UniProtKB/Swiss-Prot annotation:
Xref: PROSITE patterns: GOLD
Cytoplasmic side stretches: 192-203
Gene Ontology CC terms: COPI-coated vesicle membrane; COPII-coated ER to Golgi transport vesicle; endoplasmic reticulum; endoplasmic reticulum-Golgi intermediate compartment; ER to Golgi transport vesicle membrane; Golgi apparatus; Golgi membrane
Organism: Caenorhabditis elegans
Alphabetical GO biological process terms: endoplasmic reticulum to Golgi vesicle-mediated transport; Golgi organization; intracellular protein transport; regulation of Notch signaling pathway; regulation of transport
Domain GOLD: 28-110
Disulfide bonds: none
Keywords: Cytoplasmic vesicle, ER-Golgi transport, Golgi apparatus, Membrane, Protein transport, Signal, Transmembrane, Transmembrane helix, Transport
Source species, domain of life: Eukaryota
Lumenal side: 19-170
Membrane topology listed for this record: Single-pass type I membrane protein
Protein name in the entry: Suppressor/enhancer of lin-12 protein 9
UniProt signal peptide: 1-18
């Protein structure tokens, strides 16, 4: 029973955090997480708005060794296992842009290395529990991915709705301006023609 409780608890204890940041033009924002050797860390990101929806991404380890580097990416997902204890850094850079800020939504998921479930007496039971726990972890990761994708879709839907509303308002304003100009030109032509014929009559 203790083993079952331990395994089911894995589904709810996987640390994960979601963030929404704004990276100004020619700026780089970095974040840090302290990991132990063997810990898995997953980074999923998407550029919600700004320019061509691209951002530079970089992940470095405690030894300043580059683990991942991507340039001008609009979205992505990368998972790695910590090769040593220490602070791992992941940065989002917008240095390629001189004017446009970028809005980035990203999620960090940290999975601790496998530990034997308490109360596992025999090796076979321990192996079965480890396999079941790994399956639960994979299910948990899949559910988290679905949740994050839904969050990304909500953000993108909101951004596109704002763009559409802004575009519609501009179209309405431009149509009103064109109508005003058309009415003005029509009235001007009427007065011009009226004056022209009045002059012809006097002659």
């Amino acid at each position: 029973m203790n083993s079952l409780t331990w395994i089911l608890a894995v589904l709810f204890v996987t640390p994960a955090a979601s963030y929404f940041i704004h990276v100004d033009a020619n700026e780089e924002q970095c974040f840090f997480d302290r990991l132990t050797s063997g810990t898995k860390m997953g980074l999923m990101f998407e550029v919600a708005e700004g320019g061509f929806l691209d951002i530079d991404v970089k992940i470095t380890g405690p030894d300043n060794k580059e683990i991942y580097k991507g340039e001008r990416e609009s979205s992505g997902k990368f998972t790695f296992a910590a090769h040593m204890d220490g602070v791992y850094t992941y940065c989002f850079g917008n240095k390629m842009s001189t004017m446009t800020p970028k809005a980035v939504m990203f999620t960090v998921e940290i999975t601790e290395p496998h530990q034997q479930a308490p109360g596992a007496a025999a090796n076979q039971d321990a192996a079965d529990n480890a396999k079941l726990e790994e399956m639960v972890r994979e299910l948990s990761s899949a559910l988290m991915s679905v949740k994050h994708e839904q969050e990304y879709m909500e953000v993108r839907e909101r951004v596109h709705r704002n763009i559409n509303e802004n575009t519609n308002s501009r179209v309405v304003m431009w149509a009103a301006f064109e109508a005003f100009v058309l009415v003005g030109m029509t009235v001007g032509q009427i007065f011009y023609l009226k004056r022209f014929f009045e002059v012809r009559t006097m002659v």
